[in-house]
């Protein structure tokens, strides 16, 4: 399934249009969908989960960019043990996320990536910090 052309991506952009001030939702949709297609392929992410997870992540990415532009930060609790337990996933996201950083001229923190990881793999947090 192509995230770029999916109804989920369009719905996410529509949602963002109502809730963000500093970013263009259509630009977020385009860049985030391309990022996700490459990431999903690299992670060998299950096809059946791509649309729903893609929707959630496009919204997360839109709000993330908005936070970064507004100079607001979020903190991810237990970041060090979580990253230690999920290095491979983190490294793949970190390598692909450069496309978003370049498109919007921003730097994305490890904390933001951790929240993406939990959206992709919800069960990884409890296992890592237990």
Feature-to-residue mapping (PLM):
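A cross-family "folded-core" feature that marks the main globular domain of proteins
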Residues: 4-130
């Amino acid at each position: 399934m192509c995230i770029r052309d999916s109804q989920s991506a369009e719905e996410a952009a529509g949602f963002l249009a109502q809730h963000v001030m500093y970013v263009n939702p259509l630009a977020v949709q385009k860049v985030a969908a391309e990022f996700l297609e490459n990431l999903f392929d690299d992670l060998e992410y299950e096809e059946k989960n791509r649309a729903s997870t893609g929707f959630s992540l496009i919204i997360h990415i839109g709000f993330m960019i908005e936070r970064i532009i507004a100079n607001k930060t979020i903190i991810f609790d237990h970041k060090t043990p979580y990253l230690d337990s999920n290095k491979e996933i983190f490294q793949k996201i970190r390598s692909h996320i450069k496309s978003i950083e370049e498109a919007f001229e921003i730097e994305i923190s490890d904390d933001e990536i951790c929240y993406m990881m939990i959206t992709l793999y919800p069960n990884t947090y409890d296992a890592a910090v237990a």
